[in-house]
Amino acid sequence: MRKVAIYGKGGIGKSTTTQNTVAGLATMDRKVMVVGCDPKADSTRLLLGGLAQKSVLDTLREEGEDVELEDIRKPGFGESWCVESGGPEPGVGCAGRGIITSINMLENLGAYEEGENLDYVFYDVLGDVVCGGFAMPIRDGKAEEIYIVCSGEMMAMYAANNICKGIMKYAESGGVRLGGLICNSRNVDNEKEMIEELAKKLGTQMIYFVPRDNDVQRAEINRKTVIEWDDTVPQADAYRGLAEAIDKNEMFVVPTPLEIEELEQLLLDYGLMEA
């Protein structure tokens, strides 16, 4: 079983990318569980046909400790399994703790056991804040390979670099490695070349360039992943391509984060910042 975490700055399209990738893997007959680690609890909605799933923390608050696996894990598109860790009430407590509680509960209830025949577990993690709780999947060895969703926008690249600092810190003590950058295009000038160069400087690869396409929004309005909505459109091919690239990936590295000056120089070189 491959344990994958998807990180990236808020609003970059992590949840959309994760769910569409999982749909792509499902069409390749891979058995996948998705664990949403974002307090917004929107990491599985498209796989569940638009249903808002009750989160692990909400279930615990309402039912107490007496929880069965089927209470927190729902079947989604392509025989995937869907879990949302959820978060605390706004203004109270730490969302990172919710991730820790959820993953421990899934382990105790046997969600990862061999009889489940999982090929992958995907953690979709809020990524601007590399605080201890959100870093938990990489810190405690729950995730072994990380993909960072980014774009050619400055803040997305800053966030990617910061996440690499977190990976580097925990790679020394555990087995976590960076599998690559996924460029979720924002149609920025020179975007593909810039992310390829950023990946090179980080010691990794741009594993896939996902073009920007309104079919993603059309599918979301229909509460589906692109592949489930219309598997003949070019964007469905893009997500299948990304799923295949992850499935075949063999490049796992400890990243070499950039100093802020190097990152700014990269942005200057590609015309995103004025000298």
Curated annotation (Swiss-Prot):
Its cofactor is [4Fe-4S] cluster. CDD domains: NifH. PROSITE patterns: NIFH_FRXC_1, NIFH_FRXC_2, NIFH_FRXC_3. It holds the Pfam family Fer4_NifH. One of its GO terms (biological process) is nitrogen fixation. It catalyses: N2 + 8 reduced [2Fe-2S]-[ferredoxin] + 16 ATP + 16 H2O = H2 + 8 oxidized [2Fe-2S]-[ferredoxin] + 2 NH4(+) + 16 ADP + 16 phosphate + 6 H(+). Transmembrane segments: none annotated. The reversible ADP-ribosylation of Arg-97 inactivates the nitrogenase reductase and regulates nitrogenase activity. Homodimer. PANTHER family: LIGHT-INDEPENDENT PROTOCHLOROPHYLLIDE REDUCTASE IRON-SULFUR ATP-BINDING PROTEIN (PTHR42864:SF2). This is Nitrogenase iron protein. It comes from Maridesulfovibrio salexigens (strain ATCC 14822 / DSM 2638 / NCIMB 8403 / VKM B-1763). The gene is nifH.
